């Protein structure tokens, strides 16, 4: 699989041709983590061609605290969407996308794409209260239904695409797969990747490489805990084990013996 984690430079025409050939002809896997501030028209064109359009906005919300000035936040609370694709074996987990995120226009009901056997699907949606703001550079923002995205429609921040041979709607002849996220920091080079982000990334890589059997929540690393017991508590535990428990067993045995003799 080929992963592009937050590319700040666009693909050249030659690189785009190589990537397209790898994906369509060799049925390779692609994973894009888009940098919302980067200008990548060639990469975006490839995605739009297959039903996923980066919008160039910023997903945000406004925090209102009584007595304080309202403040916009770019840390987006998102939920994974169950269904076909890399999230099908993951429960409806939630996480935060840190930094700046752009929303995605996912054409999962487009008749033309369906006829061409191209299946885009949303994978992540922002929680209630977030929207795709087009005029995000201004200090004070508010949702404008004429130019912004969301409310009441869901704001998608990740999507998958599966493309098969024309007429092969069950993908029995194989398929080309890609996953795109509108945020470059789902996996952090500083080692601050969330558990949900790591699970989603591994699931995406396994899915685009047709290794569905490996998709799921990764096992947690065993952690050793030390239980500190004071001298007084230790003496109490010893008394319970030496006197109380044998005494209790003796009493129960005596009761049973008496009842049987009666």
Language model features by range: what are they?
Residues 186, 216-241:
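Short, aromatic-rich amphipathic segments at membrane interfaces
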Residues 246-259:
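Alpha-helical transmembrane segments
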Residues 73-80, 229-240, 254:
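Short, charged low-complexity intrinsically disordered segments located at boundaries
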Residues 1-213:
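Acidic, S/T/G-rich, low-cysteine, solvent-exposed domains in lumenal/extracellular/periplasmic regions
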Residues 210-217, 249:
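Intrinsically disordered or highly flexible coil/loop and linker segments, enriched in small
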């Amino acid at each position: 699989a080929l992963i592009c984690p937050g590319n700040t430079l666009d693909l050249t025409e030659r690189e785009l041709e190589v990537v397209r050939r790898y994906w369509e002809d060799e049925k390779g896997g692609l994973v894009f983590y888009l940098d919302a501030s980067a200008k990548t028209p060639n990469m975006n064109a490839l995605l739009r061609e297959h039903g996923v359009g980066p919008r160039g906005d910023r997903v945000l919300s406004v925090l209102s605290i009584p007595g304080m000035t309202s403040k916009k936040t770019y840390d987006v609370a998102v939920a994974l969407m169950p269904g076909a694709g890399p999230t099908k074996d993951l429960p409806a987990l939630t996480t935060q996308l840190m930094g700046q995120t752009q929303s995605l226009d996912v054409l999962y009901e487009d008749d033309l794409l369906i006829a061409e056997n191209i299946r885009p699907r949303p994978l992540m949606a922002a929680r209630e209260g977030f929207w795709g703001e087009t005029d995000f550079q201004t200090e004070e923002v508010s949702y404008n239904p004429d130019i912004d995205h969301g409310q009441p429609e869901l704001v998608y921040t990740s999507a998958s695409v599966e493309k098969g041979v024309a007429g092969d709607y069950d993908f029995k002849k194989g398929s080309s797969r890609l996953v795109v996220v509108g945020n470059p920091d789902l996996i952090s080079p500083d080692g601050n990747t969330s558990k949900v982000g790591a699970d989603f990334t591994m699931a995406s890589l396994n899915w685009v490489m047709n290794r569905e059997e490996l998709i799921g929540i990764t096992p947690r690393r065993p952690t050793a805990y030390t239980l500190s017991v004071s001298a007084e508590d230790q003496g109490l535990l010893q008394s319970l084990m030496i006197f109380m428990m044998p005494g209790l067993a003796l009493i129960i045995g005596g009761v049973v013996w008496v009842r049987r003799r009666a």
